[in-house]
Amino acid sequence: MISLYGPGFIGRNFYHMYEPETEIVNKDDREPKSKDILYTISTVDNYNVHDKITLDVDTNLHVLCEVLDHCRSEEYTFNFISSWFVYGKGGYLPASEVSVCNPRGFYSITKKC
């Protein structure tokens, strides 16, 4: 079973592809339902800094830290889904596991895990 955090566009499509093996975690829950986690929670753009200055931090970091806190005492497989923003200007796509991250803005810094 896979605990899915964040059933937005990517999470919802993953869920529909692997529905029998995936359980969506309620947005207010921090404790995973299984030892395998797919974490896709994120704000959807990098323009919140103009009118909701703490939204990216609250969404991208606080919730992540609270979920990770529940994972401290046991062994979990934690898959964190990020975005191309973390590679910054001059980044090459497709990125690989060894690609250098060079975030250029506040949103992308919160996504660099």
Question: Where in this protein do the model-derived segments appear?
Answer:
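NAD(P)-binding Rossmann-fold cofactor-contacting core
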Residues: 20-30
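N-terminal Rossmann NAD(P)H-binding glycine-rich loop of SDR-like oxidoreductase domains
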Residues: 1-20
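NAD(P)H-binding glycine-rich loop region in Rossmannoid oxidoreductase-like domains
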Residues: 29-62, 70, 86
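Short hydrophobic segments within beta-strands
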Residues: 4-5, 40, 81
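Conserved Rossmann-fold NAD(P)-dependent oxidoreductase catalytic core, especially the SDR/UDP-sugar
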Residues: 66-104
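Short, glycine/charged-enriched secondary-structure capping and boundary segments
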Residues: 18-19, 51-54, 92-96
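Active-site Tyr-X1-5-Lys
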Residues: 102-113
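Short glycine-/acidic-enriched loop or helix-start segments at secondary-structure transitions
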Residues: 13-15, 48-50, 88-91
